[in-house]
Amino acid sequence: MRECISIHVGQAGVQIGNACWELYCLEHGIQPDGQMPSDKTVGGGDDSFNTFFSETGAGKHVPRAVFVDLEPTVVDEVRTGTYRQLFHPEQLITGKEDAANNYARGHYTIGKEIVDLVLDRIRKLADQCTGLQGFLIFHSFGGGTGSGFTSLLMERLSVDYGKKSKLEFAIYPAPQVSTAVVEPYNSILTTHTTLEHSDCAFMVDNEAIYDICRRNLDIERPTYTNLNRLIGQIVSSITASLRFDGALNVDLTEFQTNLVPYPRIHFPLVTYAPVISAEKAYHEQLSVAEITNACFEPANQMVKCDPRHGKYMACCMLYRGDVVPKDVNAAIATIKTKRTIQFVDWCPTGFKVGINYQPPTVVPGGDLAKVQRAVCMLSNTTAIAEAWARLDHKFDLMYAKRAFVHWYVGEGMEEGEFSEAREDLAALEKDYEEVGMDSGDGEGEGAEEY
């Protein structure tokens, strides 16, 4: 079996976790108490969904997941929510005081008190797996727990499970709106610390998702539940090939192989289509060509940046539902003839396709329409460097005045860590720039670094 363990860290991670597991349960017909009427085999069968759920002798399906937060309120909602019987109480881990939006508290002071307990619980889950494939880690960049504790946990996971893949789903701070003033600090510190421990990181920015909810779903004031359900659909599309049998299945490690040309350049851009409300879907049936085209519209991306300014290095199209390879090939051929989509000259073919016959499921009473087919595109493009540049600029503005730095130093960090992290990200921006150059331009100067 190729099991995956999901780790949800901090408020953002836990709330996205709720949305994801709610959706997985609906997709597999698992009830909130963990029973699955359609599953006739008792105990751990060899069904595809066993990658994400373990089965008890009593026929209960338990998610292979851990929820961690340094303060209890958010996880308490899981403990009392609809799906409270789904999880083993030991899978929900909380501390007493939160990280107060402070990376240093999440990584050093408060985080280190709880990290051994968390690793212990993860070890228990890992021991139930016959062939653990890797970890999916959900967190935000901006919060103290999401940034600090995640980076601590990733370092420890690398020690304990060296070669296992670690994929991140990270909530990147939105360009305009912000939930904390110190987001740029936390983001840059966590990116620097986890850069060498993460194999692939899918970034999602709240503002981009707000805009999609407003524009495509006509939700005037999107709530976090609206956002998370949309993120849940995306995560579900990415993991569908692990949980269902399909025509072209894609493995966790396969994502990395096809999307990550150099170890540091592992931040694919995620685009999902169609995001459409029930009223609209009633009147239009979207063809494979239409949803494929929609993926190349910057408006449907999960991070605000413009791929038309960058170059694509690799592209992975994950279709689900009523899709046949013939239509996909035609749609991709059309895309390739359009000159707006530029690939780097050292990666000529760049499209990987996965097809899964399980149509997208939607949460009843949710905002998304039930559609026959959907596609999730993961693309590694140099345009995502815009997102880093934006963040680095905000960091510089604050750091030039050493604003808020004393909160971090007071928790045992050194100022040197800030400049070290900032230099690392400057190098990352440079890496992206070099990758986007034509092979003729920079004659092998970058070659020594890798």
UniProtKB/Swiss-Prot annotation:
Its EC number is 3.6.5.-. It is found in: Cytoplasm, Cytoskeleton. Mg(2+) binds at residue 71. The active site is at residue 254. Keywords: Acetylation, Cytoplasm, Cytoskeleton, GTP-binding, Hydrolase, Magnesium, Metal-binding, Microtubule, Nucleotide-binding. The modification N6-acetyllysine is found at residue 40. GO terms for cellular component: astral microtubule; centrosome; cytoplasm; microtubule; nucleus; perinuclear region of cytoplasm; spindle. It catalyses: GTP + H2O = GDP + phosphate + H(+). Undergoes a tyrosination/detyrosination cycle, the cyclic removal and re-addition of a C-terminal tyrosine residue by the enzymes tubulin tyrosine carboxypeptidase (TTCP) and tubulin tyrosine ligase (TTL), respectively. Disruption phenotype: RNAi-mediated knockdown eliminates microtubules in fat body cells, resulting in defective nuclear positioning. SUPFAM superfamilies: Tubulin C-terminal domain-like, Tubulin nucleotide-binding domain-like. GTP binds at residues 11, 71, 140, 144-145, 179, 206, 228. Its main location: cytoplasm. The record marks 450 as: Involved in polymerization. It holds the Pfam family Tubulin_C. GO terms for molecular function: GTP binding; hydrolase activity; metal ion binding; structural constituent of cytoskeleton. Its cofactor is Mg(2+). GO terms for biological process: lysosome localization; microtubule cytoskeleton organization; mitotic cell cycle. Belongs to the tubulin family. Dimer of alpha and beta chains. A typical microtubule is a hollow water-filled tube with an outer diameter of 25 nm and an inner diameter of 15 nM. Alpha-beta heterodimers associate head-to-tail to form protofilaments running lengthwise along the microtubule wall with the beta-tubulin subunit facing the microtubule plus end conferring a structural polarity. Microtubules usually have 13 protofilaments but different protofilament numbers can be found in some organisms and specialized cells. Interacts with Ote. Tubulin is the major constituent of microtubules, a cylinder consisting of laterally associated linear protofilaments composed of alpha- and beta-tubulin heterodimers. Microtubules grow by the addition of GTP-tubulin dimers to the microtubule end, where a stabilizing cap forms. Below the cap, tubulin dimers are in GDP-bound state, owing to GTPase activity of alpha-tubulin. This is Tubulin alpha-1 chain. It comes from Drosophila melanogaster. The gene is alphaTub84B.
